[in-house]
Amino acid sequence: MMRRVIVLAFAAAAAAGPALAAEPDGKALFTRECGICHLQGGTGTFMLGRRLGEANAMLEARRNLTAPYVKRVVRYGLNSMPRFTRAELPNSDLDAVAAYLTRAR
């Protein structure tokens, strides 16, 4: 009986494995993939400050970003920002970054 319970427990855990996979962490992805340019002191932050004013320089603090806009800029680039392909930043990661940058504040 005990052996049967253990086998069933392992089978249930194995079946639930993919469903328990963690969703991408938007903040961690932003820091890792975008932070070199878009955190304090980065080139992207500097350029946005010059173009849009200091209030809009830090992406994490902006309230006027939308997810479609973030995704479009990342995929196609804008001004001096290069585009990022799906191989460089998969759609699921881009979705997580866009959700992080447009979260309710």
Predicted regions and their residues:
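Bacterial N-terminal signal peptides that target proteins for export
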Residues: 1-7, 82
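Bacterial N-terminal signal peptides
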Residues: 5-16
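Non-catalytic alpha-helical scaffold/packing segments enriched in small hydrophobic residues
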Residues: 9-10, 25, 29, 96
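Electrostatic cytochrome c docking/interface patches
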Residues: 15-29, 45, 67
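Periplasmic/extracellular electron-transfer cofactor-ligation site
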Residues: 27-55, 72, 79-80, 103-105
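Extracytoplasmic electron-transfer domains, predominantly the class I c-type cytochrome c fold
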Residues: 53-105
